[in-house]
């Protein structure tokens, strides 16, 4: 089977493990984008700690789940958004105004939409979680 998007595979594994009530999930392969996306999720307390296991191949990530994720996904294609369009995308993708986060990649790094608004920058949409 050919992997189209490793980030999409990772987020699907997390959602499936959450629905089954698992406490941990093993995700492979590892990538910098996945690690940064998980750091945003951990900062917002949607997942617990995660550990990167180097197996001298593509790497693995062991993620501790805390039962807060209802849905997460990748936005493909990665649309360009300006600062003004972030709120439109948030209302389109998230269930309510103060629930959930959109993750974007900007020139300042990977961050959620609230941090992008405070830093006054736009970027490309990566995904969302709530």
Swiss-Prot record:
The keyword Heme does not apply. SUPFAM superfamilies: Ribosomal protein S8 (SSF56047). GO terms for biological process: translation. One of its GO terms (cellular component) is extracellular matrix. It comes from Dictyostelium discoideum (Social amoeba). Keywords: Ribonucleoprotein, Ribosomal protein. GO terms for molecular function: structural constituent of ribosome. InterPro entries: Ribosomal_uS8 (IPR000630), Ribosomal_uS8_CS (IPR047863), Ribosomal_uS8_sf (IPR035987). Belongs to the universal ribosomal protein uS8 family. This is Small ribosomal subunit protein uS8. Pfam families: Ribosomal_S8. The keyword Isomerase does not apply.
């Amino acid at each position: 089977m050919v992997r189209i998007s490793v980030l999409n595979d990772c987020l699907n594994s997390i959602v499936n493990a959450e629905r089954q009530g698992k406490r941990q999930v093993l995700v492979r392969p590892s990538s910098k984008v996945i690690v940064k996306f998980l750091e945003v999720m951990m900062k917002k307390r949607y997942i617990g700690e995660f550990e990167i296991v180097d197996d001298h191949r593509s790497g693995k990530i062991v993620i501790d789940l805390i039962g807060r994720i209802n849905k997460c996904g990748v936005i493909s294609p990665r649309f360009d958004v300006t600062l003004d369009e972030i709120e439109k995308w948030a209302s389109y993708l998230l269930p309510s105004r103060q629930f959930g986060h959109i993750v974007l990649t900007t020139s300042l790094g990977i961050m959620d939409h609230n941090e992008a608004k405070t830093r006054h920058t736009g970027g490309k949409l990566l995904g969302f979680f709530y």
